[in-house]
Amino acid sequence: MNQLDALRQYTTVVADTGDFHQLAQFQPRDATTNPSLILKAVQKPEYAPLMRATVAQYKGRSLDEVMDRMLVRFGCEILNTIPGRVSTEVDARLSFNTSATVARAERLIELYQAEGVHIDRVLIKIASTWEGIEAARQLELRGIHTNLTLLFSFCQAVACGQAKVQLISPFVGRIYDWYKKQAGAQWDEAAMAGANDPGVRSVRAIYEHYKHFGIATEVMGASFRNTGQIVALAGCDLLTIAPELLAQLGASDAPLSRALDPEAARTLELDPVHYDEAGFRLALNEDAMGTEKLAEGIRAFAADTRKLEALMQQAAD
């Protein structure tokens, strides 16, 4: 049995791509997208017509509406290939605006429903700021399910659990990147691999907290740099994996066993944790890695959204 099939015994495998032509090869249940992945996709010849057609059909509409319609078209194409859910991201520039995030999420859902997609097949991706988490809380109360992304710090995960969001995406690779950069020449790749990887340790702590305290929010590890990180998180509720790493797992027959176990998590001695807004902001501020990577991630997604808008404007001319 290859590692990808072995992983499926313990974890729901999700494809992290906007390239829906690749999906059938790996048979994921769900798929995730973000502005960077969509930008990458529309620059490929096979996807450019989809963007041009969307821009032409809705010529004269606001740029943000045309953007949402294009994201939904990608999402619908993905849903034609997979049995589960697609995650579609709200504009990262709204990450500090609760009401605007709610409004944009509701529009995305309306657009999906107009295409005949059931609300339960869509997760709205929102950055894990305090404002984003509050928006997700409100959306969940309205039956719109959310995926809280750019999650690097334990306090973000706790707040998401309190808000009863559907799913969180704690990042592994970007945490690994930060600690490796900080260590510089002192970094020992072998010693910090697998279960010792700082990104893996972060997701494990979140998973154990959720399972120990019976928090229903799904944990989906994201942002992987190598298959060792994935193997070390076998048993996590879901893992969203880029096609290149899915292919590597499918080509490997190395042993893979469960690393995260909900029953084991329930036996741990853990203290309950709760955050109000002030406590959340202080805890995040105290976490230099979490603060820096959250800000960096929002900036990067915002920049790629602007690049997408520029391509759409070119297509409209």
Curated annotation (Swiss-Prot):
InterPro entries per record: Aldolase_TIM (IPR013785), TAL/FSA (IPR001585), Transaldolase_1 (IPR004730), Transaldolase_AS (IPR018225)
Source domain of life: Bacteria
Record-listed E.C. numbers: 2.2.1.2
Subcellular location: Cytoplasm
Gene Ontology annotations for the cellular component aspect, listed alphabetically: cytoplasm
Active site residues according to the UniProt entry: K125
A biological process term (GO) from this entry: carbohydrate metabolic process
Coarse class of the protein's main subcellular location: cytoplasm
Example GO molecular function: transaldolase activity
Pathway where this protein functions: Carbohydrate degradation; pentose phosphate pathway; D-glyceraldehyde 3-phosphate and beta-D-fructose 6-phosphate from D-ribose 5-phosphate and D-xylulose 5-phosphate (non-oxidative stage): step 2/3
Reaction catalysis annotation: D-sedoheptulose 7-phosphate + D-glyceraldehyde 3-phosphate = D-erythrose 4-phosphate + beta-D-fructose 6-phosphate
CDD domains referenced in this protein's UniProt entry, alphabetically: Transaldolase_TalAB
Cited Pfam families: TAL_FSA
Enzyme class name: transferase
Keywords attached to this entry: Cytoplasm, Pentose shunt, Schiff base, Transferase
Protein purpose: Transaldolase is important for the balance of metabolites in the pentose-phosphate pathway.
Family assignment from sequence similarity: Belongs to the transaldolase family. Type 1 subfamily.
Stored NCBIfam families: talAB
Assembly description: Homodimer.
Identification of the protein by name: Transaldolase
Gene: tal
